[in-house]
Amino acid sequence: MRQIAFYGKGGIGKSTTSQNTLAAMANRHGQRIMIVGCDPKADSTRLILDAKAQTTVLHVAAELGAVEDVELDQVLKPGFGGIKCVESGGPEPGVGCAGRGIITAINFLEEEGAYTDLDFVSYDVLGDVVCGGFAMPIRENKAQEIYIVCSGEMMAMYAANNIARGVLKYAHAGGVRLGGLICNSRKVDRETELIENLAARLNTQMIHFVPRDNVVQRAEIRRLTVEQYAPEDNQAQEYNKLAEKIINNEKLTIPTPLEMDELEELLIEFGLLAATKKIVRNKLQHKMQQQQKK
């Protein structure tokens, strides 16, 4: 059994990318998969289940009084391709640590024997910054392969570098390795070249470039993966290619994160930092002009 995790900047399309890829792994390649959602939004399994946000382990435990009172079938639901789906959940906004939900859920699943008869366990983890709680799948050596979903946008690359730094921190103590960068395209100029360059500097690979296609949004509106909604579409083939690459991936490395000035040099080299600063400068000038008119 292989334990993988998808990390990435908030809003980058991490949950969408992971569910579409895992759907192809299960449906086309017969892989037995369990998804453990590690995001308080509980949206890591929505497309696989063709349903609204799944009831979380923490929610059921709170209703019953303790996690020891929870039955496995109350929180583990089968979805498309036989994929088992669990959402860890989190506390009320502003109260407690969301990372605690991940720890509670994983311990519960292990004690209940949920990790048997599987080829892959996939953790879908919130993460602009790998804080202690959200790093739990890495820190406790649960997730062995980390895939970072990013794009050619500056903040997505900044987050990818931060996550690589978190992987490095625990790589020597445990067996966690970086499996590669998944570029979820935002149609940035020279995006493929940029992410390949970043991957090389991080001592990893751009495992796949996922082109931007509106069919993904059309499927999402219907709470479906592209594999279910339009299996013959070119986008379904792209997710299948990524699925194959993950199944056959042997390039698992210890990352070499960049210093901030090195990352900025890379962005300058590709003209991205200058363009971003120009946009910010124009916005500030416009704001000042508006204030002067008042």
UniProtKB/Swiss-Prot annotation:
Q: Cite the EC number.
A: 1.18.6.1
Enzyme class, spelled out: oxidoreductase
Question: Which residues does the record give as [4Fe-4S] cluster binding sites?
Answer: 97, 131
User: Any idea which positions bind ATP?
Assistant: 8-15
Database matches in InterPro entries:
NifH/chlL_CS, NifH/frxC, Nitrogenase_Fe_NifH, P-loop_NTPase
Q: How does it assemble?
A: Homodimer.
Query: Which cofactors does the annotated protein need, by name?
Result: [4Fe-4S] cluster
What Pfam families does this protein's entry cite?
A: Fer4_NifH
Gene3D superfamilies, sorted? P-loop containing nucleotide triphosphate hydrolases (3.40.50.300)
Q: Which SUPFAM superfamilies match?
A: P-loop containing nucleoside triphosphate hydrolases (SSF52540)
Q: Does the keyword Metal-binding apply?
A: yes
Could you tell me what the cofactor note in this record states?
Binds 1 [4Fe-4S] cluster per dimer.
Q: Which family does it belong to?
A: Belongs to the NifH/BchL/ChlL family.
Please report the PTM annotation for this entry. Answer: The reversible ADP-ribosylation of Arg-100 inactivates the nitrogenase reductase and regulates nitrogenase activity.
> Which reactions does this protein catalyse?
N2 + 8 reduced [2Fe-2S]-[ferredoxin] + 16 ATP + 16 H2O = H2 + 8 oxidized [2Fe-2S]-[ferredoxin] + 2 NH4(+) + 16 ADP + 16 phosphate + 6 H(+)
The molecular function GO annotations come to:
4 iron, 4 sulfur cluster binding; ATP binding; metal ion binding; nitrogenase activity
**Name the record gives this protein:** Nitrogenase iron protein
Please name the NCBIfam families in this protein's record: nifH
Q: What does this protein do?
A: The key enzymatic reactions in nitrogen fixation are catalyzed by the nitrogenase complex, which has 2 components: the iron protein and the molybdenum-iron protein.
The ADP-ribosylarginine modification is found at 100
Q: Which Gene Ontology BP annotations are present?
A: nitrogen fixation
